[in-house]
Structure formats: C-alpha cells, structure tokens
C-alpha cells in the first residue's frame, strides 16, 4: 500500500514538473519576442506613451528623419529636430524598461516619395554618407542612451543589389554599436505564372547581407487579396496562397526560407494595414480606397497573428504606425485592431 502511494506521489511530482517547465518555457518564449510599434515621424510623445500602454508592447521603433531632397538626390542630412525629439523619447522609454529600436528613416521630398524608389545618382557617395550618418547616430544616441537594436537600412529596394556595400556597413556598425544590428528589406511578390518574379525573389533570398546581421527584418506589406473584405480564414489561406491576380504566392513558405537558409530569426519590422476597404489588396497604400473599414484592418492583423504567433523562428513584429492620430493617419490601428494586437504575445 505504501509502495503504491509512493508511486502515485512520484508520478504527480513528475507531471507537475512537466507542466511547470512547459509554462516557464512559454513565458520565456513570450518575453523574448519583440512586440513593437513604429512611430509616425510627427509623433507626439504623450500619445506614444498611451499607445504603448493600449497595445501592450515592450519595444518602440524610434525613427530619426533623414532628409533627402528627391528620389535621385545625394543630399542627405539628419534632421536635428527629429534627433532631439528622439533623444527625449528614448530617455523616457528606457526609464520605463521599454526596449528601443533606432531607425534612420529616409524622408524623401518631405515624405511624399517612397524609399523603395530611392535611387541616388552617385552610389559610392551615398554609401559613404550613409555610413557617416549611422556613425553619428551610434555616437550621439545609440550607445549613449543604451539603444537595443539598430536598423542599418530601411526598404532601399533599388540599392539592395549592392551587397558588398551593405555587408561593409553592417560590419562597420557592429564594430561600433553595442546592441543588435538588422537590415530591413521590403516585401516582395511572386506569381506562379511570372518567372521573373521568382528570379527576383531568389536574388533577394541569396543576398549575403542577411548572413551578416543578427536577425532579418521584413516590411511585411504582402498583397494578399483583391476583395474589399475578407474573413480571417480567407486571409489565413491567402498567406499560404495569395488570391490577388491569381499569383498563388506562398508568403509563409517564402518567409520561412530566409530562416532555413540563414538560421536567423525573422522580424516583421513593419506590419500595417490601412483602415479601409481593400486593406489586404495594397497594405502599403493608405489611399487604397475612399471607404473606411476598421474591421477589415483588424482581420488582417488577426490573420497574421493566427498564422505566425506560435512560430519559433518569428522574432516578433512592429505595428505601423502609431504616435499620432491625425485625420490623415489611416494606418493608425482601429479599436478592433487594438484588441487583436494587445492580446498578441500576451
């Protein structure tokens, strides 16, 4: 009898240890994930702090405006007012144990042009100047105020082919910066019927800059569906086979390929959708429709959450964009989206 009781007690202890260990592992995994927000360049610090609380995030991506005259200009300069505001915010964030990602944010033609289209005339001069800008930010902000992560490039699609230059910049930054270093690449598309799109994808996948960084960052504006509204289930299916233009792009697999090739975690450095119809058609386009649709935006976030939140190779995500709620801020998350995001990695 005593022997039977002893066996039962031993089994209960073993089961208890298993479940405790499982819960601890889950807690550790959750704590290690980045749950971040991107800020509008005209962010308000008070609003940022409110958004941090409402969205239950542990990290903030702080942009420093880099003024660029036009899409072909080599005149690039740190905006002093943006730099000073960033320092003020970073001090507050660190005092609250919020992690900080620092980003030199290309602001082209007063924000009217996309950085994905930036193509400076003098490439050699650009890389020299960009290295100098990063060096300045490291000396005056990143190391001085204990920044956790530095993004060395942001969606410079037309410059991505200069692999050696970017590898040199990553090495330069790693030799000077105390935290982690990442490179942010823009979203892409492939189509079963478009051979060129697949070639472009494999060029991106094989870019050696991804072998040099601590983790891989992606601006995840993948085009999923041409419908005005979708169910969450439809959007989940689209992430494995996009329906827009009958491309049948397997976004999940193509993202996972980066992890399999480089054994580095994947971070959604920008994850955003406009509060409008067709949010899943062109997630990058705030003017995709004239009809507001808070729930469709939330369904897009929910689809990404359901697909990616339990994947160990995903380092986390950053919501684009908060910190300012003006009438033109169509990417600012709706009430429905805030509910989805706040519960992510909880």
Report each predicted region and the residues it spans.
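Boundary/entry segment of secreted carbohydrate-active catalytic domains
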Residues: 21-57
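N-terminal Sec-pathway targeting helices
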Residues: 1-13, 17-21
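Aromatic-lined carbohydrate-recognition surfaces of secreted/lumenal glycan-active proteins
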Residues: 101-109, 149-155, 161, 170-201, ...
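Short, acidic/polar
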Residues: 39-54, 126-141, 192-209, 298-307
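Glycoside hydrolase catalytic-domain groove-lining segments
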Residues: 82-89, 96, 103, 175, ...
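Aromatic-rich peripheral "rim/lid" segments of glycoside hydrolase catalytic domains that contact
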Residues: 37-40, 112, 282-346
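Substrate-binding cleft/loops of secretory-pathway carbohydrate-active enzymes
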Residues: 169, 187-219, 223, 276-281, ...
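Substrate-binding cleft and catalytic face of glycoside hydrolase catalytic domains
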Residues: 55-73, 86-159, 275-281, 320-327
